From Swiss-Prot:
SMART domains (UniProt xref): Aha1_N
Superkingdom field: Eukaryota
UniProt-listed InterPro entries: Aha1, AHSA1-like_N, ASHA1/2-like_C, START-like_dom_sf
Gene3D superfamilies, alphabetized: 3.30.530.20, Activator of Hsp90 ATPase Aha1, N-terminal domain
Listed name of the protein: Uncharacterized protein C1711.08
Compositionally biased residues, Low complexity: 169-187
Amino acid sequence: MSATSINPNNWHWTSKDCRVWSHEYFNKELPKIQASEGPTSARITQVNSCEGDVDVSMRKRKVITIFDLKIQMEFKGETKDGVEATGSITCPELSYDLGYSDYVFDIDIYSASKEKEPIKELVREKIIPQIRQLFSGFSQVLLQTHGDDVYLSTEEHNGNAARGLPVHSSFKQNNSSQTSSNKGTTTVAAGSGSDGSRVSAVVNTADISENYTFDAPANELYATFLDPARVAAWSRAPPQLDVRPQGAFSLFHGNVVGKFLVLEENKKIVQTWRLSSWPTGHYAEITFTFDQADSYTTLRMIMKGVPIGEEEVVQGNIQDYYIRPIKTVFGFGAVL
């Protein structure tokens, strides 16, 4: 592959984390909102919390925003009789795929009383529409402010790649030496790995498991793990997928590799799986089981053969680089 083909025409995925900037933006803009109705007035005083993910990304020459936030702010008001009130407004979901009328707001008056109701009503009628307007324009503000940062020229991207600089999220590796332990482990001696490759040394291993809930049908979630376009979206890197038994896969620019072992449509995926930092030739075996319920799907993950000391690293990677982005990109549930 020639140097100029690493990122032809901004074809691959680059991304910028804008969480800190977003918090600062709302801290600045929300307190500008105020309203009055006769002698009754109210205004936003501060932002209490702004939690979630905000990314500006570029894929196939298209710059997009992906965000999912929970925002809580405080307000203060006063009635014509001099009654003062403070309270909070919570938007549980400010997401890239919601519009002006889709946002939900919970209004809470501290030490509520009948005398304070006019302030709450003013907030509902005059303050909330202004917040909706601000939120509905957030995506465009993100693009205008940060779009140029992810739209790299071919020369810029190639220069970064040549220097080994990251242009997207990559899996965390645990490169520290580990102390062997046989407690609750299986020992894999030198010989063949689960994919048929050579294991160069004895590896003490453990098993890990976790369940995840998605607001999506099993067939959609199953496809999200196998369809190249979907995998590229949530992994933020071009995948290599040979989706068939014994077909190889490579994710996150080779940080995760393995082979498909079992593919039961909409029900189960079994793979060999390894991080590039693991002992040469050693593969774990990961099973994803898709359990469909009435309105959601439970994804059951079991990984056998994780090198001792890597358990937390692997669990964190599955959460941060599989589960969280799938929910965020496709709207398959709340991000915790």
